[in-house]
Amino acid sequence: MRTVNSIRLFVLIVTLTLSTHVSNAQKIKPKNVLKDMERVADWQIEHFRDTFSIEYSKAHHIADWTNGALYVGMVKWAELAKSDKYYDWLKSVGEEQNWNLHWRPYHADDHTIGQMYIELFRKYGDSTMIAKTITGMDYIIDNPSEQPITLDKYKHLERWTWCDALFMAPPVLAKLSIITGDDKYTRFMMKEYQASTEHLFDIEENLYYRDNSYIGKLDQGNKIFWSRGNGWVFGGLTIIMEEYDEGSKEYNYFLEIYKKMAAKLIDIQTPKGHWAMSLLAQDLYPTPETSGTAFFTFGLAWGINKGILNKATYEPSVRKGWNALTSYISEDGMLGYVQPIGAAPGSAWADRTEVYGTGAFLAAGSEVYVLYGGK
C-alpha cells in the first residue's frame, strides 16, 4: 500500500510540475477564474472538519486564526458566487461560535474571525454579529498591554510581535473604526502597527522579518524573509487600505509600505510563478508554496485594479502567479503545496493543504477575476 501511495504522489507531482510550465503563458479568462474558485471553495467546505496538519490530532477550532483566514477569502467568494450557500455557511459558523472571538483577549490570532463577522454585519445589518467583537477590541484599547514589541521566543504575544499578526488584528480595528465612526480603533491600530513595522521591516529589502529571532540571522548567506509571513502583511495591507479614504494620513502610511513591497515582490518571483518559501533564497527552497503566492497575487491584482500599480509592469507577475496557483489544484478541488503551520521557510507537498491557503486563494481569485474583465 505504501508503494502504491508513493507512486500516486510521484505521478501527482510530475503532472503538476509539467502543467505549471505550460500554464504560465495561458490567458486568464474570468469564467475560468470563477470555476476554479468554486471548485476550491466547495472542496474546502466539504472537508472543513478534516485534520490537515500532521502535528495536530484534531481539526482546527472554528474560531482559530487558520479558519479566520479562510473566512476572509470565503467572504470574497460569496460576493461573487451566484448561490447564497456560501453566505449561509459563513453565518452558520458565526452562529455556532455565538459570534465570539476566540479565547485569548490580546492575541491577534484570536481576533481574525472578527473580520468575517464585520463583513456579515455589513451585508445583513444584524448588530449581534459584531457586538462581542466591539467589546473585545474596546477591552484591549482601554487596557493596553505593557509587554515589549519583541516576541522573544513566544514570551510576548499580547502585542503584534510577529508579522503574521498584521493580517489578523489590524483589519478588524480598521473596519470597526469605519462602521462605528469612532477613530479610537484607528488610533490604536496605527500606534501598534507602526511599532511592529519599526521593529520588523527591513528598509534595505523592503520586506518584513517574521519576528525578532530572524533579525540578523542568515541562511547560507541569505537574510531570512518567510514568504507566507510577508504574504500576511501584504494581503493585510490591501484589506486595511480599503477602509480609508485615498489621501488620508492612514491610507498614505500603508500605501508607502505597500508600494515598496510590491516593487520588491515582482523582482523576486520565481520563473515558475510562485514565490520561494524563503523569498531571497530560491535555490535553497525550490518547492512551490501556494499560501504566500496567493497572498502576493491577491495584493498585486488589487493594486492594479485600484490604479495604484502600473498594469504593464505588474500584470505579468499576477498572471504567472495565478496560473501557477491553479496548476496546483487537484482534480477534486484541493489546493496543494500549502506549507503547513509554521514560522519560517520549510516544506510543502502536492497532496497537502491548509485552510488558510484556501482563504488566500479565494482572495486572490476575487481580484484576478476583476483584473481580467469579470463583472
Predicted features, each with a name:
Residues 1-28:
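Bacterial Sec-dependent N-terminal signal peptides
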Residues 14-16, 24, 69, 168, ...:
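Generic detector of isolated residues embedded in canonical secondary-structure elements
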Residues 26, 31-68, 80-87, 96, ...:
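CBM-like carbohydrate-recognition segments
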Residues 87-91, 99-212, 332:
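Extended ligand-binding groove/face enriched in aromatic
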Residues 148-156, 278-282, 339-340:
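Acidic interhelical loop/turn segments
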Residues 163-167, 174-279, 286-297, 309-338, ...:
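Extended ligand-binding clefts on enzyme/binding-domain cores
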